């Protein structure tokens, strides 16, 4: 493979892969090339020098999320494959195709969302490769091939232990059971029964090896059988190639089969019964020092195995016999021999050996002496006599081991046969799908006979695999019309010849050596050396004399031949057959049935190798008779932990699994296959003329290749096929073209930058010069201006100095004059001031005495008033606080509502009275305060008057006094009194201020209390309103409960004698069986309804029809016949009202059919509707009857009410509304009672409600079912019509590359291309428009139209969104733009349809709209998880966002998806969510339920006037229908 992938054109700057001992391959950049030596700068920082032939080119344009099919890789080589698997594994994409081979990497974590029922539904019938790789896709291909071609198929699951083979097998069988559709066999499906057999087969067929603690030591081929209809009819488990030698010989640190250790860990009574002990006491187990497995309890597994045996169908007696045989094998291994008395004879070695020999005979229920003779002697039959020959101890040991291996092999075969009988096989089945689960290639430090046989098996399977891969390659080349005659087939037949060729193969030489008693492993090895010394696949190690190596397809394996002869010997000894055939245990006898006569007469040599070869031949014959499919399971790490990818380990598994061999086969032909579109997009720049011309894609690709001069390529019908290395050459040339273009662009940019720099520099120079000249002129101007200013300053300064001298002289003269005049005035002023002061003192003293007396009196009055008001305010505050505490809570109990209302009313009255009292007290207090205020004002006025009089008297006294006032001697006593009075006045002022403050506080509290009282008053009024509403609700509920109870009792009594409509279809009945959560009907609530739904027959119906009814006479029967004949016709509509519904309703109301106990008119109407809608594809008829049925249902809903039962006391039960008729009639009382039945010609709302009997209620129920049925049929028809278009709308059709190139005809071409792009979307819009027009023309209620289109848009959302998440090619930028354009068409349709008919349909597309919005948004790496999940895509879950983010690829601009940090955060959130019980599926479910109830329909439809509806001509002239004629005004 390396040589075929060797690069032929690596240049400096190329990105390449180079080998690394730690991570297998590491990428780097070529820095230097010296001949065949290349110097590479690796990404880990190291510089590595390697040979040119040892490096591989790296595809830098590979998608960031990898490719789902590795044949799409530009470079199909080891590092490319490994890197692609690693990228996908990091994104939790565990499945990858290589052609039609599926590679499955064990995630070591639960991923339930990719295995649920939604995922199985998506892959059912999907073409292979259309959706993401999955094990379901392989199973679906196998199933479809079996059904279509009638040929059996097989699925080969391989991989080393721990790679997930068993889990993959489970998923395969689960999906096949899903497709096959077989229900249950004895309570368990076939798949379950097969899986339940696993613990038994693992206990007896699995063992610990060096690499795995639970390695299968046999191959398992599960056949799932199908009948002619494709349903599972049976299954069988075939086992192959059991490693029999392990029973007797094991190497350290391996273990023998699990069953031996399980039995040794059984309960004590079991151990005593079988005389067992610790495993180390038995020879067959103590050859290895490993007896227990870490973290595994053999005792627990023993119980689990016994339980599995019970499930499989093994009786207690059979289980006891099985473990008795297992114990016998352990004891048999402890029987040792020594030389006997005779020559070359042998006998049991000691008492211990005799004990074990006796125990074996006891357990097998055979004779001890016969057992000893069978082990130590041989019988030779000659024509003359029968000769008994003794065996030496070594031969006796070989005989013992042969017996042990034979017993164990027969026991294992019996177990498999028993399991097959339990599962049940179909002997008549001609088609089957087989699932092969077999051990993979093994290579250990010590490889013995077991590894030789296993690797021989894998060589055979690899040859089969190679042939299949080559066949697929041939089919691909033939399909594309490629010449492949010269391509060599990679085969491993030479290895198979080396092993199995007869004579002369290794197996034949081994059998030959085993036939000679004196042969040893040394002689056998020498024989091999001599025979195969020139064979290129056989290698003789230099440091060993007995080892040999074989160059297998997966690598060289060195075998140790020490135990080859012992492990290969498998004599068919008649003595053993006779011994166990004569056992007293029926189970043992069943293991050894009598042999054919010719076989029993001879002791023919048999070996395990030859048996192995025969079984392998049978397996290959089975596989060759089927069409194979391959699944290669890979274990990503030996730690068994998620998110750990060990490159070296996986690379070895890919080699061992043949994946790299398949790639080598592909590389022998044309490993690189590019569709024309991708090839032209990538390499069109190598020859632009091919793009400029209006060429087809194939012609353009051919011109590009011809211009390049590439050798060895071929152009197919849809792809370009390139030989190994040619892709690298094309990329190298492309890199050179891109480099030249980059250099040209850089040159242009540098020229442009230099030119810009020169222009900027020139502009700066000119600006600097202009600035300098301006500064110089400015300085000259400044000097001139300063000189003029200096002259002007000097002139002003001289003038100012002269003026200042004059002013100083003038001021000095004025100052002298002023001083003289002031002295004279000052003397006069001082004399007058002294005279006035004496007069003022005398006046103030007299005023002070009067004021003191007034203040003392005022203080006492104010103090007494203030304290009294404070006392009243505090008393009022206490009363308000007490009143506020008395407000209580309303009780919720229904029986206490009346008391609460009375109590609240009483409290309201008290509150009103208290408020009135408060207002009265407040008014009285205000009056008192006002009167006190008036008194105080009067007193103040009187005091003021006295003061005024005293002042006037004082003034007069002063004026009358003599002009010269003499100073009066003031006594000391008067001065002290004045001071005391002053202090008292100040104290009174302070007390007055305090009392004022208290009064203000009391006033403020009073205002607050008044506001609080107002709030409580408002709350009380609200409470009174609520109490009144609750009282009304209680009254209504009591009335409903009473009516429902009485109605239910009447209906139960009448239900026994009334038969329902026999014409109600099965679908209608199923529609009735819905839960009560949505308000729909449910027939599972009453057993009586089941009686009505299933017990009707024609005889009963005829009896009901023939029996004369009390409420109808013969004339009415004739009228009913005429009505039925009339409504069969298409009566059309009048004023948007369906005539049929209006006529039926009027007739039923006039005939009082709703109120009679028995009538057949309802059944006949329902029968007519059922017959009319039998043609489910005619949407016009369905819309017509949907309009009529919904209108009639509305009329019944607003007219009928359930009748009560006389003499029955109503009982209140909450559960009454949960019954069928409880829910059905709960809405009968929604309209107020009307006026009169005579007002039939008016609107529906003017009619009184009619008490309906059971037939009317049943009729309404059946009519409801038909409305829902017709609605579902219309919706499903529209879904069927648009489903094929949706599959085409999710991915943009590819356009010719020529249309993307500039040219004169580009606009015309683009217009046509745009029309072609949206053709599928326009088809959907056309279907929606036709359906809308059909519904509108039949006047279907807009409410139902909205519901239809809401569910249709939800269906579109689910289908497009699920397809987007399952197909990576759809998650591209350009495809997002395409779907966005299509969604715009749907939005435009919603706008044209208006909200009346489209409703919220556009909102139902929220998932696909947000997903598309994510695809087309720019700068995704800059978006944070919070922005994405809360702003851009708030509706999408983390699983859905993770799926889109990892599958996104930009085919237009080459941008990347969101940042790795966002991806890591999404993983953390998904891990946390995986612990919840909520499904982790990223797919959406389609809701096909009925999204409305009768109440919803009734509330949405407007009032219907039926009085002026003209009857049809058929009944217009009939006098019996005169009531249908409109009344004249």
Curated annotation (Swiss-Prot):
One GO MF term attached to the UniProt entry: actin binding
Localization: Cytoplasm
SMART domains reported for this sequence: DIL (SM01132), IQ (SM00015), MYSc (SM00242)
GO biological process: actin filament organization; actin filament-based movement; organelle localization; pollen tube growth
UniProt-annotated binding residues for ATP: 159-166, 212-220
Domain Myosin N-terminal SH3-like per the UniProt entry, residue ranges: 11-60
Chain intervals with Basic and acidic residues compositional bias: 993-1027
Gene3D superfamilies, sorted: 1.10.10.820, 1.20.5.190, 1.20.58.530, 6.20.240.20, Kinesin motor domain (3.40.850.10), Myosin VI head, motor domain, U50 subdomain (1.20.120.720)
Location of the region described as Disordered in the Swiss-Prot/TrEMBL record: 993-1031, 1096-1115
Every Dilute domain range: 1163-1472
Keywords: Actin-binding, ATP-binding, Calmodulin-binding, Coiled coil, Cytoplasm, Motor protein, Myosin, Nucleotide-binding, Repeat
Record remark on domains: IQ domain mediates interaction with calmodulin.
Name this protein carries in UniProt: Myosin-11
Source organism of the structure: Arabidopsis thaliana (Mouse-ear cress)
UniProt lineage: Eukaryota, Viridiplantae, Streptophyta, Embryophyta, Tracheophyta
Gene assigned in the entry: XI-E
């Amino acid at each position: 493979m390396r040589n075929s992938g060797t690069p032929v054109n690596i240049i400096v700057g190329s990105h390449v892969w180079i080998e690394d001992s730690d991570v297998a391959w590491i990428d780097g950049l070529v820095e230097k090339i010296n001949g065949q030596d290349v110097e590479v700068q690796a990404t880990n920082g190291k510089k590595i020098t390697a040979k040119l032939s040892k490096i591989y080119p790296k595809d830098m344009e590979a998608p960031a999320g990898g490719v789902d099919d590795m044949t799409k890789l530009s470079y199909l080589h080891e590092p490319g494959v490994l890197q692609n698997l690693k990228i996908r594994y990091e994104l939790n994409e565990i499945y990858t195709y290589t052609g039609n081979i599926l590679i499955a990497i064990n995630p070591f974590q639960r991923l339930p969302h990719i295995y649920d029922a939604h995922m199985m539904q998506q892959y059912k019938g999907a073409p292979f490769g259309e959706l993401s790789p999955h094990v379901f896709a392989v199973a679906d291909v196998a199933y479809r091939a079996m059904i279509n071609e009638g040929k059996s198929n097989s699925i080969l699951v391989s991989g080393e232990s721990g790679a997930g083979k068993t889990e993959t097998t489970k998923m395969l069988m689960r999906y096949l059971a899903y497709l096959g559709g077989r229900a249950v066999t004895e309570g368990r499906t076939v798949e379950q029964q097969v899986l339940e057999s696993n613990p038994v087969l693992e206990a007896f067929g699995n063992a610990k090896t060096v690499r795995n603690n639970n390695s299968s030591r046999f191959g398992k081929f599960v056949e799932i059988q199908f009948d002619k209809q494709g349903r599972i009819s049976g299954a069988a488990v075939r086992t192959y190639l059991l490693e029999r030698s392990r029973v007797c010989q094991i190497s350290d640190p391996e273990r023998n089969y699990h069953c031996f250790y399980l039995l040794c860990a059984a309960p004590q009574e079991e151990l005593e019964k079988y005389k067992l002990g610790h495993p180390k006491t038995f020879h067959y187990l103590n050859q290895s020092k490993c007896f227990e497995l870490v973290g595994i309890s053999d005792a627990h597994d023993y119980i689990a195995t016994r339980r599995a045996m019970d499930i499989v169908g093994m009786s207690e007696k059979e289980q006891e016999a099985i473990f008795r045989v297992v114990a016998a094998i352990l004891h048999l291994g402890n029987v040792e021999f020594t030389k006997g008395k005779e020559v070359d004879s042998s006998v049991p070695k000691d008492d211990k050996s005799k004990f074990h020999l006796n125990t074996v005979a006891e357990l097998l229920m055979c004779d001890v002496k016969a057992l000893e003779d069978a082990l130590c002697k041989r019988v030779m039959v000659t024509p003359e006599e029968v000769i008994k020959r003794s065996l030496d101890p070594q031969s006796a040991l070989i005989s013992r081991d042969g017996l042990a291996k034979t017993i164990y092999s027969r026991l294992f075969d019996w177990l498999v046969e028993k399991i097959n009988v339990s599962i049940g096989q179909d002997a008549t089945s001609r088609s089957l799908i087989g699932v092969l689960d077999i051990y993979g290639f093994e290579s250990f430090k010590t490889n013995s006979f077991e590894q030789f046989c296993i690797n021989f098996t894998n060589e055979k399977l690899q040859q089969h695999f190679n042939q299949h891969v080559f066949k697929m390659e041939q089919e691909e080349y033939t399909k594309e019309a490629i010449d492949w005659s010269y391509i060599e087939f990679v085969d491993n037949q030479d290895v198979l010849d080396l092993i199995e060729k007869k004579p002369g193969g290794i197996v034949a030489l081994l059998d030959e050596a085993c036939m000679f008693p004196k042969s040893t492993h040394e002689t056998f090895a020498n024989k091999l050396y001599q025979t195969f010394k020139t064979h290129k696949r056989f290698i003789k190690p230099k440091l060993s004399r007995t080892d040999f190596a074989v160059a297998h397809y997966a690598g060289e394996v060195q075998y140790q031949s020490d135990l080859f002869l012992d492990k290969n010997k498998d004599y068919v000894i008649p003595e053993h057959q006779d011994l166990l055939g004569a056992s007293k245990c029926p189970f043992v006898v069943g293991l050894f049935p009598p042999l054919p006569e010719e076989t029993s007469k001879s002791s023919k040599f048999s070996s395990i190798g030859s048996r192995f070869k025969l079984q392998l031949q049978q397996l290959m014959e089975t596989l060759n008779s089927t069409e194979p499919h391959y699944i290669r399971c890979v274990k990503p790490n030996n730690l068994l932990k998620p998110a750990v990818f060990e490159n070296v380990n996986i690379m070895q598994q890919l080699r061992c699994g043949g994946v790299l061999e398949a790639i080598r086969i592909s590389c022998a032909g044309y490993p690189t296959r590019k569709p024309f579109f991708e090839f032209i997009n990538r390499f069109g720049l190598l020859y632009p003329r091919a793009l400029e011309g209006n060429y087809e894609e194939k012609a353009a690709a051919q011109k590009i290749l011809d211009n390049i001069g590439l050798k060895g390529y071929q152009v197919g019908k849809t792809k370009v096929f390139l030989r190994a290395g040619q892709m690298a050459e094309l990329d190298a040339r492309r890199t050179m073209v891109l480099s030249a273009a980059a250099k040209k662009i850089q040159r242009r940019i540098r020229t442009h930058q230099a030119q810009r720099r020169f222009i900027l520099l020139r502009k700066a120079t000119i600006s600097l010069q202009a600035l300098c000249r301006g500064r110089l002129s400015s300085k000259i101007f400044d000097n001139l201006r300063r000189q003029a200013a200096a002259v002007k300053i000097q002139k002003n300064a001289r003038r100012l100095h002269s003026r200042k001298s004059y002013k100083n002289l003038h001021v000095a003269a004025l100052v002298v004059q002023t001083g003289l005049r002031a002295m004279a005035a000052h003397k006069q002023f001082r004399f007058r001031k002294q005279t006035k002061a004496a007069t003022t003192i005398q006046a103030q003293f007299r005023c002070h005495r009067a004021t003191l007396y007034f203040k003392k009196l005022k203080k006492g009055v104010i103090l007494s008033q203030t304290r009294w008001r404070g006392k009243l305010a505090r008393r009022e505050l206490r009363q308000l606080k007490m009143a506020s505490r008395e407000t209580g809570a309303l009780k919720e109990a229904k029986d206490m509502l009346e008391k609460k209302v009375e109590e609240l009313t009483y409290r309201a009255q008290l509150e009103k009275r208290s408020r009135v009292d408060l207002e009265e007290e407040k008014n009285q207090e205000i009056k008192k305060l006002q009167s006190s205020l008036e008194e105080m004002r009067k007193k103040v006025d009187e005091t003021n008057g006295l003061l005024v009089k005293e002042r006037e008297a004082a003034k007069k006294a002063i004026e009358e006094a003599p002009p010269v006032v003499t100073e009066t001697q003031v006594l000391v006593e008067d001065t002290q009194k004045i001071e005391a009075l002053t202090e008292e006045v100040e104290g009174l002022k302070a007390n007055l201020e305090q009392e004022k403050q208290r009064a203000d506080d009391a006033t403020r509290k009073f205002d607050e209390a008044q506001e609080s009282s107002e709030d409580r008053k408002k709350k009380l009024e609200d409470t009174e309103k609520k109490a009144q509403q609750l009282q009304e609700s209680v009254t209504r509920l009591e009335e409903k409960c009473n009516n429902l109870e009485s109605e239910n009792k009447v209906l139960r009594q009448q239900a026994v004698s009334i038969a329902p409509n026999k014409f109600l279809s099965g679908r209608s009945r199923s529609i009735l069986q819905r839960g009560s959560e949505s308000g729909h009907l449910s027939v599972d609530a009453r057993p009586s309804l089941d009686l009505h739904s299933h017990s009707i027959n024609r005889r009963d119906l005829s009896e009901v029809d023939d029996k004369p009814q009390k409420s109808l006479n013969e004339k009415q029967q004739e009228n009913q016949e005429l009505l039925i004949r009339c409504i069969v016709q298409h009566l059309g509509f009048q004023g948007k009202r369906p005539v049929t519904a209006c006529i039926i309703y009027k007739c039923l109301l006039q005939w009082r059919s709703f109120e009679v106990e028995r009538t057949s008119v309802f059944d006949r109407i329902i029968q007519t509707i059922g017959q009319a809608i039998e043609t489910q594809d005619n949407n016009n008829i369905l819309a017509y009857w949907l309009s009529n049925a919904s209108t009639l249902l509305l009329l019944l809903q607003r007219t009928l009410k359930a009748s009560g039962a006389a003499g029955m006391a109503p009982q209140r039960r909450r559960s009454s509304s949960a019954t069928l008729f409880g829910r059905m009639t709960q809405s009968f009382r929604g309209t107020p009672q009307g006026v009169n039945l005579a007002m039939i010609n008016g609107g529906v709302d003017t009619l009184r409600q009619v008490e309906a009997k059971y037939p009317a209620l049943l009729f309404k129920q059946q009519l409801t079912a038909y409305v829902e049925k017709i609605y579902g049929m219309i919706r499903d028809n529209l879904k069927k019509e648009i489903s094929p278009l949706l599959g085409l709308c999710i991915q943009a059709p590819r356009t010719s590359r020529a249309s993307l190139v500039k040219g004169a005809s580009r606009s015309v071409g683009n217009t046509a291309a745009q029309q072609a792009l949206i053709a599928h979307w326009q088809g959907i819009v056309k279907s929606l428009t036709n359906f809308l027009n059909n519904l509108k023309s039949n006047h279907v209620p807009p409410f139902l139209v909205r519901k239809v289109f809401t569910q249709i848009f939800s269906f579109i959302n689910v289908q497009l969104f699920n397809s987007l998440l399952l197909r990576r090619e759809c998650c591209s930028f350009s495809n997002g733009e395409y779907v966005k354009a299509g969604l715009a068409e749907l939005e435009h349709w919603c706008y044209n349809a208006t909200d009346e008919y489209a409703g919220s349909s556009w909102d139902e597309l929220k998932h696909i709209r947000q997903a598309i919005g994510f695809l087309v948004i720019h700068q995704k790496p800059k978006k944070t998880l919070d922005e994405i999940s809360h702003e851009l895509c708030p509706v999408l879950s983390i699983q859905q966002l993770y799926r889109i983010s990892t599958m996104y690829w930009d085919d237009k601009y080459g941008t990347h998806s969101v940042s790795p940090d966002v991806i890591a955060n999404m993983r953390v959130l998904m891990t946390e969510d995986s612990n919840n019980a909520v499904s982790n599926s990223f797919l959406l479910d389609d809701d096909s339920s009925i999204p409305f109830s009768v109440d919803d329909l009734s509330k949405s439809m407007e009032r219907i006037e039926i009085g002026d509806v003209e009857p049809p001509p058929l009944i217009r002239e009939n006098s019996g229908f005169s009531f249908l004629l409109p009344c004249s005004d």
